[in-house]
């Protein structure tokens, strides 16, 4: 069984590593091909819209068929085909198609997260999800770290050659994944149950905040940050420093939030602070002309955004009944993909109309909107908590 776990972990890594290997250089690459910011934003947003359209149907269909492996193989094939298209053409239309395929590939992640826990006993499921989540972060970090250096050595196509090679290996290895007959079974998703979960007010609030958070990160670090960095004197090989400056604090923040910030401030206050600082440091980016100061801003931006995502993930299912949490998580993941689509799409339009700085102002304001919503909702949550406390004390008396 250990061999099966290790193989699955490797395949999971090979799904994400190729997709993030070219992310820091992707927008500048399209710019060199003559892509306007509006088009670049649309290409970046296609990754999110395909996840929005495909993630829930893939989850539901795999539940109905009670198999995951075919969907995993399909995801690896889509990833490989995406990389091959990037390699074979400089056509902006085909680049859009290739990035959309990458989005379909990412949507199959739902099948990965259902199959992997079946290698574990019931009480080890959280450990399983922790392991596979770490692999995603590791793949993202390693992929993004090397892209700038690869471009300097082998040109703009270099990352796609390496990504294509790794994705071919991923397809081959995915054929040997073991899908156990026994393990944790999930009931097929019922439409009525999905509708009930989606109407849950707490989930909708958190999902809206997550849309705003994903709009910020996919318009900045996973979007136009590299373009702006190149305009203030960074070279392609130095994009690696920006990735390190952002991603290391981003990862550290995920550990910091649960152990320090939430016990100290509470969930809603911690979230308010994180969104506010993420907004401030995003709004600062267009004012920075010094490379050293730019890296400093990325450090604080990465840390602030790193606080937000685990907080939202916990809040998404906190008030959902345990038997509906899998459904809630599927719905939550599908809904926040709206942010992966809308953020880069509108940032690209603003950049085209008013220059590269405009997109940062746009998503920075989104962060302030999120902060305002949290202040309003946080007061309501505090009021409800006081009312519950009063009722309990009266009942006790």
Give residue spans per PLM region.
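Juxtamembrane intracellular "pre-TM" segments in multi-pass secondary transporters
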Residues: 1-2, 178-209, 393-397
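Helix-loop boundary and gating motifs at the non-cytosolic
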Residues: 2-48, 204-205, 215-232
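Interfacial helix-cap and linker-helix signal at transmembrane-aqueous boundaries
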Residues: 30-31, 61-62, 146-154, 229-230, ...
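Conserved MFS/SLC helix-loop-helix module at the cytosolic interface between two early adjacent transmembrane helices
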Residues: 53-90
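Helix-to-loop junctions at the C-terminal end of transmembrane segments
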Residues: 54-66, 253-266, 351
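Structural signature of the two symmetry-related core transmembrane helices
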Residues: 70-84, 164, 269-283
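Cytoplasmic helix-loop-helix junction between adjacent transmembrane helices
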Residues: 98-136, 315
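C-terminal membrane-cytosol helix-exit motif in multi-pass small-molecule transporters
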Residues: 164-183, 370-378
């Amino acid at each position: 069984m250990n061999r099966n776990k290790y193989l699955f972990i490797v395949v999971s890594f090979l799904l994400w590593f190729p997709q993030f290997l070219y992310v820091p250089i992707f927008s500048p690459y399209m710019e060199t091909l003559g892509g306007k910011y509006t088009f670049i934003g649309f290409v970046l947003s296609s990754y999110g819209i395909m996840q929005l359209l495909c993630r829930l149907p893939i989850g539901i269909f795999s539940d109905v068929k009670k198999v995951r492996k075919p969907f995993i193989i399909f995801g690896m094939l889509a990833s490989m085909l995406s990389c091959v298209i990037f390699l074979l053409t400089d056509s902006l239309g085909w680049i859009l198609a290739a990035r959309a395929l990458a989005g379909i590939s990412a949507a199959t992640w739902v099948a990965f997260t259902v199959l992997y826990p079946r290698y574990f006993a019931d009480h080890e499921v959280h450990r399983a999800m922790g392991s596979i989540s770490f692999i995603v972060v590791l793949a993202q970090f390693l992929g993004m770290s090397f892209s700038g250096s690869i471009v300097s050595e082998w040109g703009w196509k270099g990352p796609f050659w390496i990504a294509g090679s790794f994705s071919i290996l991923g397809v081959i290895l995915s054929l040997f994944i073991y899908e156990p007959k026994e393990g944790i079974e999930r009931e097929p998703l019922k439409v009525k149950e999905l509708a009930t979960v989606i109407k849950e007010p707490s989930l909708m609030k958190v999902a809206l905040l997550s849309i705003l958070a994903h709009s910020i990160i996919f318009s900045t670090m996973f979007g136009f940050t590299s373009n702006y960095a190149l305009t203030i004197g960074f070279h392609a090989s130095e994009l690696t420093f920006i990735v390190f400056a952002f991603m290391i604090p981003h990862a550290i923040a995920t550990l910091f939030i649960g152990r320090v910030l939430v016990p100290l401030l509470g969930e809603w206050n911690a979230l308010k602070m994180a969104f506010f600082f993420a907004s401030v440091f995003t709004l600062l980016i267009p004012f920075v002309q010094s490379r050293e100061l730019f890296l400093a801003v990325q450090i604080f931006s990465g840390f602030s955004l790193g606080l937000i995502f685990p907080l939202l993930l916990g809040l998404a299912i906190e008030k959902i009944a345990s038997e509906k949490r899998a459904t809630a998580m599927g719905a939550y993941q599908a809904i926040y993909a709206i942010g992966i689509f809308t953020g880069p799409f509108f940032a690209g339009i603003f950049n085209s109309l008013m220059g590269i700085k405009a997109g940062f102002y746009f998503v920075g304001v989104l962060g302030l909107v999120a902060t305002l919503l949290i202040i309003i909702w946080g007061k309501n949550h505090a009021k409800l908590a006081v009312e519950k406390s009063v009722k309990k004390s009266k009942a006790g008396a």
